[in-house]
Amino acid sequence: MKKILIAVIAALTLTGCSLTEPIPVRGEVVSCADIKTVASSGSVLDCLDGSEGLAVESIVGPALINVWGTWCAPCRQELPHLAHYLGTKNPVQVIGIAVEEKNTASVKKFVETHGMTWPILYDASGSTRSQFGMGVPVTWFVDASGTVVYKKYGPFKSVEEIQLNVIKYLGVK
């Protein structure tokens, strides 16, 4: 009996350590106007808030471009980590690209109810599929010159993972 109790306590402790903290804020649809860009001839994506769209190729960093979908369970799992990372007041901009969505209204509702506070581009036509590939989530690390220096496939498991990758690939602490 004592061994079972110890095993249960250990399991609960380990489970508690792996749980993601709740997202600290209510989400909001954010303007794309503050995204750092340069002139580009790429295909323009709409901004979720209705402000002027932009081409993915025009984004300069340091930046994380996170491709996701409301229907994607791993994407939802990494959202709290991205939200907490933004809460650290870091100098790296985070930009989301919502893909394979039925309409902007459902994406806006998702953003607001899931604590997302970063600009979201909307890929209604699937034009980024050839750039980012078929699977999501995928996050591109873009340096100050606009060069993609690393592609992270799959969800972030912690805010520390994001921070370590930002230091490693973008040189930003």
Task: Describe each model-derived feature in a short phrase.
Residues 42-63:
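A short beta-strand-turn-helix
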Residues 76-114, 124-130:
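Structural microenvironment flanking redox-active thiols in thiol-disulfide oxidoreductases
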Residues 112-116, 123-173:
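Thiol/disulfide oxidoreductase modules built on the thioredoxin-like
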Residues 1-46, 161-164, 168, 172-173:
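N-terminal targeting signals for export/organelle localization
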Residues 61, 91-92, 117-118:
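A generic structural signal for alpha->beta connector loops
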Residues 61-63, 68-71, 135:
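Short pre-active-site segment immediately N-terminal to redox-active cysteine/selenocysteine motifs
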Residues 64-65, 94, 139:
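Hydrophobic beta-strand anchors of alpha/beta hydrolase catalytic cores
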